[in-house]
Swiss-Prot record:
PANTHER family: DNA-3-METHYLADENINE GLYCOSYLASE. Pfam families: Pur_DNA_glyco. This is Putative 3-methyladenine DNA glycosylase. It comes from the Bacteria. Belongs to the DNA glycosylase MPG family.
């Protein structure tokens, strides 16, 4: 672990999900592997507010093998696959409050050669500018499901304070009724790595 990248304490995650989605912007997501570390600053997130949010996997208190981790305490990893992509979420809420924040995009920081190799043939801007892209670039897999984010090999460290945060509707949730209009997607204004 790079001593400059001290993992954020568990207390950091103990805040309302919308607030956490905003607070994660500018933080550094780090994944250590045998090949070396790779990291990026979080520049885009989406909040999912559990049982009352039709876009959340836990809508209506659906408790399945896949969503079980969402019912734990905040500050652990919820990974799932969509098509051929693994996506990473930060579990929020508290025990039995199944909420999460999807990490949608990163600005590459460390391990650029590793990211280039893992995202072979892609332009640097396309390494991490989407939720399925960033997990490939950092080698985040389903094996990371349930990991605490408070220490290696996968953790979040303090980064920088964004100057300007924008919000709007979440992406790719067209079948979720009124929930598709909730302004629970957050991004750093002007950052070229934001997905759209």
């Amino acid at each position: 672990m790079n001593p400059a990248h001290e993992p954020l304490p568990l207390e950091f995650y103990n805040k309302p999900t919308i607030e956490l989605a905003r607070s994660l912007l500018g933080c550094l997501l780090v994944k250590e592997t045998e090949e070396g570390p790779a990291s990026g600053y979080i520049v885009e997130t989406e909040a999912y507010k559990g049982p009352g949010d039709r876009a959340a996997h836990s809508y209506g208190n659906r408790r399945t093998k896949r969503t079980e981790i969402m019912y734990r305490e905040a500050g652990v990893v919820y990974t799932y696959t969509m098509h051929t992509h693994t996506l990473i979420n930060v579990v929020s809420g508290g025990a039995d409050e199944p909420e999460a924040v999807l990490i949608r995009a990163l600005e590459p920081h460390e391990g650029l050669a590793l990211m280039e190799k893992r995202r072979s043939g892609k332009k640097p801007r396309d390494w991490t500018n989407g939720p399925g892209k960033l997990t490939k670039a950092l080698s985040i897999t389903m094996n990371d499901y349930g990991r605490p984010l408070t220490g290696p090999p996968l953790y979040i460290a303090k980064g920088y304070e964004p100057q300007d945060i924008l919000s709007g509707p979440r992406i790719g949730i067209d079948n979720s009724g009124e929930a598709r209009e909730y302004p629970w997607r957050f991004w750093i204004k002007g950052n070229r790595y934001v997905s759209r």
